[in-house]
Regions:
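Conserved N-terminal segment of class I S-adenosyl-L-methionine
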Residues: 1-102, 111-115, 184, 209-220, ...
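Hydrophobic/aromatic residues located in beta-strands of well-ordered beta-sheets
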Residues: 60, 128-130
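Short catalytic micro-motifs in class I SAM-dependent methyltransferases
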Residues: 102-109, 131
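A short glycine-rich, Lys/Arg-flanked "PGG" loop and its adjoining helix->strand segment in the class I
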Residues: 112-127
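Feature marks short, surface-exposed loop/turn motifs that line or immediately flank catalytic pockets
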Residues: 125, 136-138, 186-188
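Short, glycine-/aromatic-enriched active-site segment of Class I SAM-dependent methyltransferases
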Residues: 130-161, 166-173, 196-197
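Conserved catalytic loop of SAM-dependent methyltransferase domains
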Residues: 180-213
């Protein structure tokens, strides 16, 4: 079920999220250069990513099982398949040039099957962009070892898969994709090591989230967004960052 407060929060932070959406879409558009292009967002929620894609002249479709989120997206003019990804794959006849998914792969029973299905849904040379939490990373290890914290990122029953940069790339390779770019998001664990203990403290959690947003918005508004992207690309190579984002291309079978 979708929490209305979550939608409200995303609305309020929309200018920030649009920067991250543009980053992703620009990377995808380096490969997908044709005029008439179509993108699928798996678990699109209220459709904010697809709104941004639409502004960039993409034809868009979102898959979303939550009726509330699906209706919200439809009201914003986004085409929605209100179903699970599995059900969608059984009946869908369309092909896509790109597939985006954020915070989906860690919840599914069979991530390999999802990647195989995505391969089938894409046109040749199509692009996939997956974002997942970066768990059991070196900073988290330092936090548990040095600050004596529990493994706070383990979240059953919601999260049943845990990924590193390497394991996510390997998963995609096994399904016939060739990863071509990776980046991470700000390593929120830095804040724990700075002394801001946001674990189980929503007030501090909110504060550090705002700090991270401010940093990225300042870089963007001063024409330094590429500095951020290069930094996050480097973080990804080193295996740090709260989330990891992998871009991969469907190669001919």
């Amino acid at each position: 079920k979708m929490n209305p407060a979550y939608i409200k929060k995303d609305e309020l932070e929309n200018d920030y999220w649009n920067i991250t959406f543009d980053d992703k879409l620009k990377t995808i558009e380096k490969i997908i250069t044709k005029k008439n292009k179509k993108i699928l967002d798996i678990g699109c929620g209220p459709g904010f990513f697809l709104q941004q894609a639409k502004k960039r002249k993409w034809n868009v479709l979102g898959i979303e099982p939550s009726t509330m989120a699906a209706n919200y997206a439809r009201n914003k003019g986004i085409q929605i398949a209100e179903s699970t990804f599995e059900s969608f794959c059984l009946t869908n006849k369309e092909k896509f040039d790109a597939i985006h998914s954020k915070f989906f792969l860690e919840h599914v029973r069979d991530p390999k099957q999802v990647c195989n299905d995505c391969y089938d849904l894409l046109n040749t040379n199509g692009v996939i962009c997956f974002e997942v939490p970066n768990d059991f990373n070196i900073l988290q290890k330092i936090v548990t070892d040095k600050l004596n914290k529990k493994q706070y990122w383990i979240a059953p029953p919601q999260h049943i898969n845990y990924f590193s940069m390497t394991s996510l790339q390997n998963l995609l390779k096994k399904s016939g994709f060739k990863p071509f770019y990776a980046e991470s998001t700000f390593p929120l664990e830095f804040f724990l090591l700075f002394g801001f203990d946001y674990i189980d403290n929503d007030k501090i959690g909110k504060k550090i989230h705002n700090m991270r947003m401010n940093l990225e918005k300042f870089l963007q508004s001063t024409g330094n967004n590429q500095v951020k992207r290069d930094l996050y690309n480097y973080f990804a190579e080193k295996g740090i960052g709260r989330e990891i984002i992998v871009y991969a291309k469907k190669i001919k079978a």
